[in-house]
A protein has these predicted regions:
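N-terminal DNA-binding recognition helix of tyrosine site-specific recombinases/integrases
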Residues: 45, 49, 57-69, 76-113, ...
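Short basic/aromatic active-site micro-motif
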Residues: 62, 146-147, 248-266
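N-terminal DNA-binding module of tyrosine recombinases/phage integrases
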Residues: 1-61, 65, 212-215
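DNA/chromatin major-groove-contacting recognition/catalytic segments
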Residues: 133-137, 189-195, 199, 203, ...
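C-terminal catalytic core of tyrosine-transesterase DNA break-rejoin enzymes
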Residues: 100, 151, 155-162, 237-242, ...
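Short, polar N-cap/turn motifs at the start of nucleic acid-interacting alpha helices
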Residues: 170-177, 248-249, 268-287, 294, ...
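Active-site/catalytic core of tyrosine-dependent DNA strand-transfer enzymes
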Residues: 131-132, 194-248
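Basic, Lys/Arg- and aromatic-enriched nucleic-acid-binding interface segment
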Residues: 85, 100-160, 164-165, 174, ...
Length: 307
């Protein structure tokens, strides 16, 4: 269904009898399919966590009371507050779009819910000694590309999916850049490559050729030799490498946090880290501010040099 159709059809029934499930299926889902690569995740989240409670409610009938009850129900089911917030974000986004399409007059109900308490953002960083031992162990893995991928993630701060789905045509060695056509934020972004990153990519090319994997513009940077497709993830092999070097409670995504922490601790500004990580909002990067607590003191101490 086209969005134009959505706007035209809305006036016929929306204000009174459009239930959330129909809105999601007939209107919202086709809309996000047109631009959002992760629409399947939203579809799963909706039907798993939102539809059972709200699906049969009319859009205009959803009240803050319902949202509070739903939050309590999610909590009773054992979901962490951080997870509930993620579910709530989708519901809010759906209602915000409904307002923009004039399907409902406002989205106050989903914004007047009780405050959800959440602890500190989970931050797990590896120190240089751990990084060196982990990379060394990953290169010993039976997984043909684990070592290259892990090292590249630490060197670039890329999201795992950005490396996993990268193609050779996205890499410009002369410009020292890997282009992500559509990032998590829905925008094109550039990942800058250091000389070491370029060497790792060259090693990936050599490894691929030795395995008989095509290295053409349209081929994936890291391709499963058995399926000819990109790997779904690297978590199993990564977890084995972690266990072998005695590192606990670390995810692949924590390599991105490690990259950010190394930058901050070496004097890179939050603004620069934001750009390198591809964060759409400085609020996302602000979580790393505590990593360089002496920066303000250093600035004050340096002031006399300017006088």
């Amino acid at each position: 269904m086209k969005i134009a159709d959505t706007t035209t059809r809305s006036k016929a029934f929306v204000d009174h009898d459009l239930i959330l499930c129909r809105y999601f299926t007939d209107f919202y889902l086709p809309y996000i399919k047109s631009y959002k690569k992760t629409y399947k995740h939203d579809r799963y989240t909706y039907f798993k966590h939102i539809d059972p409670f709200f699906g049969k409610l009319e859009l205009n009938a959803i009240k803050a009371m319902h949202v509070d009850q739903w939050i309590a129900e999610q909590s009773d089911q054992g979901y962490k507050n951080s997870t509930i917030i993620k579910h709530l974000v989708l519901l809010k986004r759906m209602m915000r779009v409904a307002v923009r399409w004039e399907l409902i007059t406002n989205d106050k109900a989903v914004n007047n819910h009780r405050k959800i308490q959440i602890g500190d953002f989970r931050q797990k960083f590896l120190v240089p000694e751990q990084i060196r031992s982990l990379i060394k162990e990953c290169y010993k893995s039976q997984h043909p590309f684990l070592g290259y991928v892990v090292e590249l993630l630490i060197l670039t701060g890329a999201r795992c999916g950005e490396i996993r789905l990268a193609k050779w045509c996205n890499i410009d060695m002369d410009e020292c850049a890997l282009t992500v056509p559509v990032s998590k934020t829905g925008k094109r972004r550039t990942i800058y490559l250091s000389e070491r990153s370029k060497k790792v990519i060259a090693l990936i090319r050599k490894r691929s050729e030795s395995l008989g994997i095509p290295v053409t513009n349209d081929a994936y940077l890291v391709q499963n030799p058995r399926t000819g497709k990109p790997y779904n993830d690297f978590q199993v092999s990564f977890s084995r490498a972690l266990a072998a070097v005695g590192i606990n409670d670390v995810r692949v995504h924590d390599l991105r946090h490690t990259y950010a922490s190394l930058l901050i601790q070496n004097g890179v500004s939050l603004y620069e880290v934001q750009k390198l990580l591809g964060h759409s909002s400085p609020n996302m990067t602000q979580r790393y501010a505590h990593l360089n607590p002496n920066s303000l003191k250093q600035i004050v101490n340096n002031l006399p040099a300017f006088l």
